[in-house]
């Protein structure tokens, strides 16, 4: 089997998406674990600022990967070079496939997660607001993880199998 440029691009895109989602899950886990720490205030704020930057970086990377997935898939199907990414017929085919369903499910969840990560006030003493903000990101992470069940081996499985896979991904 010969790897084309499109195959390499799609592999890199999936790798970026996986790393971004894993990074978002990791930063969220660290955020919740540090919520009850006994560390001095300024050190916690510095660490939270670090986590916030990484959350935003992960969500932006995931968003870019999700936005590029459809045109790159269309270009790979068109096999007509760079302009194949903008072929209306191929774009329509990809948007109407499970790849389009995955993108339409994942992109809004990533946008909401980005807004929530940007709105996280790390200097606030209001723990309830911080937990609500983290809960929104966690719910969006669940939606993003569920979007992975639209394609691949689990695409034809029932809801229970998809739920188990989503739980496993998180």
Regions found by a protein language model. Give the residues of each.
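Polytopic transmembrane helical bundles with strong interfacial aromatic enrichment
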Residues: 1-170
